[in-house]
């Protein structure tokens, strides 16, 4: 009978989703597509920081103090900002959280805060892409030295190799996209963030999708999971 009632109210089911995956796996793109499809907000920690700082909120002022010194915003403050964002009207049917948690302590703190509020995460979607693919994807990016336009040597090449289509200036490989930099970021990810996969698997909310296929195919696989 309980299942029957749940099915009847399927339309109103609240969907609280966390996106997992290595940097460059495409989780941000998929988060935006999920948000559009299910009419729930795509929430990233960067956006929350910027909005609170811009609006001069108490939490925003505290976060700005750390950021101005080039320090990481402490987990506790980040979590306060996130939980505050969840109270907004547009989150009443759920949200897609992207970029948090990144560590087990963050995941445990989020879990505790949600439980205290009588809430829980419904899905943790892991976009799986091997390191080799990510290094190739990211080290293929090129940026224009003048106008900042971005391209990719394989997926979005310019008409003339190494020259910006828009302004005709030279393209460069940014330091952030150099293979060794990308691999270093992936090493940090495997050490800090990979354990989250087991954390959410143990909670029975993990869903894994192959992120090596076409972007639309990745999204279709996610839609199948979410229903």
Feature locations, PLM:
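Glycine-rich phosphate-binding loop of ATP-dependent small-molecule kinases
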Residues: 6-227
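Short, small-residue-biased leader/transition segments that mark boundaries at the very start
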Residues: 1-5
